[in-house]
UniProtKB/Swiss-Prot annotation:
GO terms for molecular function: ATP binding; proton-transporting ATP synthase activity, rotational mechanism. Gene3D superfamilies: 3.40.50.12240. CDD domains: ATP-synt_V_A-type_beta_C, ATP-synt_V_A-type_beta_N, V_A-ATPase_B. The lineage of its organism: Bacteria, Bacillati, Bacillota, Clostridia, Eubacteriales. It comes from the Bacteria. Pfam families: ATP-synt_ab, ATP-synt_ab_N, ATP-synt_VA_C. One of its GO terms (biological process) is proton motive force-driven plasma membrane ATP synthesis. Belongs to the ATPase alpha/beta chains family. Keywords: ATP synthesis, Hydrogen ion transport, Ion transport, Transport. This is V-type ATP synthase beta chain. Produces ATP from ADP in the presence of a proton gradient across the membrane. The V-type beta chain is a regulatory subunit.
Amino acid sequence: MLKEYRTVKEVVGPLMLVDQVDGVSFDELVEIELHNGEKRRGKVLEINKDKAMVQLFEGSAGINLKGAKVKFLGKPLELGVSEDMLGRVFDGLGNPKDGGPKIIPDKKLDINGIPINPVARNYPDEFIQTGVSAIDGLNTLVRGQKLPVFSGSGLPHAELAAQIARQAKVLNSDSKFAVVFAAIGTTFEEAQYFIDDFTKTGAIDRAVLFINLANDPAIERIATPRMALTAAEYLAFEKGMHVLVIMTDITNYCEALREVSAARKEVPGRRGYPGYLYTDLSTLYERAGRILGKEGSITQIPILTMPEDDKTHPIPDLTGYITEGQIILSRELYKKGIMPPIDVLPSLSRLKDKGIGKGKTREDHADTMNQLFSAYAQGKQAKELSVILGESALSDTDKLYAKFADAFEEEYVSQGFTTNRTIEETLNLGWKLLTILPKSELKRIRDEYLEKYLNKAEESK
């Protein structure tokens, strides 16, 4: 039988201190009954002798120290999971938000999950087509990878997230594909945009949405990505689905961690974030991957906004250490009207070479990717030189590279948020752009591919 305590000693912000407790465990779920019969939930953050620090999910407003009853439920926060979750919208704590019935769960799972044994991991090597050329062609996403998007305030990362969620699929696979989408600390307008976009395009049928609004309690923001990843693990490893998890905005998650850390009077780390920020983020990102002998997989695209567009800020900095690359959105390209404004040169997918080539995308993928990177970099240098010295200082070849850079941004990178390009279309477009340059400049492509694909591209111009 569960004990009931009436020994609430102190309430500060989202934290409650309960005295004279016995047999309480870390991370245990707590039920608080107010003097008016209202029930709220929390979890145990810290235990010191007979005192327990409880973090409240719904906030502390209206709690009377003398009238509150506290029960420790002897289990962690859990999510009831079922295949019926597909097509549904939930709040940040896993409660239905779409007016539909409650889910009848197949089982209840601890939202903290169980780490995947490194020995049991299967290496990511299957191409995922997002329909976005700057990702598919140059910074390829691979099944089981974690590839974050580094954005800035006001940049269209929400539109890019919705586009990837709509369009993503694993090529040459009969397995079911699902999307788990977690909106963390989002505004009402942005949340409605995601729900409307998923519903209008039919993507909702294969998706599970967890929406945590900006005015929801901070502790719910900490639980939301874990709810999403728990649902993803169930669909991937028990139902054999390929699951793409998109989480936006990780910056809001880290702000919630900082808020709770400050309330606990912990010693702050860099820029006031807790010293365990790296460890905490790794508990989210490391839940991506594939397991030997299991059909399903979890691929992650966490999206974060860099404060003041600063790549050295602790959140993007630590995220970069844990994940396998980054897709960077550029404010300069955004101002030019390039959509999506993906800056391909500083962007990187560390596993891109594992998911491309014959039998996966196309035999010429690696060579054309290297040549496009090289040509675009030289084109940008030529344009910078022309700004300093004038266009007359450029050689004929430099002028062609500058022309290539403009065409590359306008035709290859820029495709809008509704165009879904196949990998064939992306590769063919790359060849078409390379015809701007003399054949003698295409030194990174093997002769056999030049003969096979360059002539076709020139004929189709």
